[in-house]
Amino acid sequence: MAGVKSLQPRLISSFLGNNSIRSTQPLIHLFRFDLGRRHVSMQLSRTFSGLTDLLFNRRNEDEVIDGKRKRLRPGNVSPRRPVPGHITKPPYVDSLQAPGISSGLEVHDKKGIECMRASGILAARVRDYAGTLVKPGVTTDEIDEAVHNMIIENGAYPSPLGYGGFPKSVCTSVNECICHGIPDSRPLEDGDIINIDVTVYLNGYHGDTSATFFCGNVDEKAKKLVEVTKESLDKAISICGPGVEYKKIGKVIHDLADKHKYGVVRQFVGHGVGSVFHADPVVLHFRNNEAGRMVLNQTFTIEPMLTIGSRNPIMWDDNWTVVTEDASLSAQFEHTILITKDGAEILTKC
């Protein structure tokens, strides 16, 4: 599909990095966030085909912000960490082309649900352990090393590693970084906030979760953003259940963000997750009129990203790291949930 000129890029997923998605939908639909797909099957191209420049304003990294906080700068990225041969790897790791969002809902049987619970619990344990490492002076690369080791010691594979060329086992997004921060040599500083996004592949199923942690003494403005972002996720999960419209998730999150005058990032979405890392449904975190209802025994993520200032993203030249255009703080929380007859079960909760 990469060479078909009539096809236009359409959607950025929650974890796509330097990959374009193509479908038969016109490009303008991307900017209107018209995500009605009518069962369009999508694939990724390793060439970005200008999509990054269309979606993300690339700005000079030397722009300055107020004197209270230094603008985030990239550090040195260490070599990719090895994974023992006995660890089962997701199919995309050895592929020359990263997968996109797979069309079609995955509805789990009893065994699938058990596997999802196991991967979700492990992801949650790793996430919480990583949070204990957040201290001034600790580098995000050190956090990545600890996460990597804990995952493989438990017989699982760190899902981000090798996904479309992503070089690390976890995403670490500090301060104005909205998502997909690459762990590097930068030491955390007192007052930072950091989102740690963990996904594990265990027994053929992915468990996906993230949380934003405080580093040292964090000011009240940052604390409030983090607390409200967590509240938005909790409220969204509370309304989920069989037959509920997906669009209600976006309304709940957007309404709470508006109440506190926060921005809601639109370019990144929640998604189905299971035996495939990213699948239907596409879960929007802002108000929308998209069709679709939740189905018993399906699993998907909800992962709102709220900002104090501009909700518009800038992508760094690494084609992964996404930051707010005005360097304002961003926070995110994420859970994988299972739709049950009584509502929703949080799978990524210890």
UniProtKB/Swiss-Prot annotation:
Top-level taxon of the source organism: Eukaryota
Residues holding substrate: H180, H278
Region of interest (Disordered), residue spans: 71-90
CDD domains named in the record: MetAP1
Entry-linked InterPro entries: Creatinase/aminopeptidase-like, Pept_M24, Pept_M24_MAP, Pept_M24A_MAP1
Expression across tissues: Ubiquitous. Preferentially expressed in green tissues.
Subcellular location: Plastid, Chloroplast; Mitochondrion
Residues the record lists as binding a divalent metal cation 1: D197, D208, E334
EC code(s) of this entry: 3.4.11.18
Cofactors demanded by this protein: Co(2+); Zn(2+); Mn(2+); Fe(2+)
Residues the record lists as binding a divalent metal cation 2: D208, H271, E303, E334
Catalysis performed (reactions): Release of N-terminal amino acids, preferentially methionine, from peptides and arylamides
GO MF annotation terms: initiator methionyl aminopeptidase activity; metal ion binding; metalloaminopeptidase activity
Modified residues annotated as N-acetylglycine in this record: G50
The record's free-text note on cofactor binding: Binds 2 divalent metal cations per subunit. Has a high-affinity and a low affinity metal-binding site. The true nature of the physiological cofactor is under debate. The enzyme is active with cobalt, zinc, manganese or divalent iron ions. Most likely, methionine aminopeptidases function as mononuclear Fe(2+)-metalloproteases under physiological conditions, and the catalytically relevant metal-binding site has been assigned to the histidine-containing high-affinity site.
Transit peptide: 1-49
A single BP term in Gene Ontology: proteolysis
GO CC aspect terms: chloroplast; mitochondrion
Keywords: Acetylation, Aminopeptidase, Chloroplast, Hydrolase, Metal-binding, Mitochondrion, Plastid, Protease, Transit peptide
UniProt similarity note: Belongs to the peptidase M24A family. Methionine aminopeptidase type 1 subfamily.
HAMAP family linked to this entry: MetAP_1
Role of this protein: Removes the N-terminal methionine from nascent proteins. The N-terminal methionine is often cleaved when the second residue in the primary sequence is small and uncharged (Met-Ala-, Cys, Gly, Pro, Ser, Thr, or Val).
Identification of the protein by name: Methionine aminopeptidase 1D, chloroplastic/mitochondrial
Organism in which the protein naturally occurs: Arabidopsis thaliana
Gene that specifies this protein: MAP1D
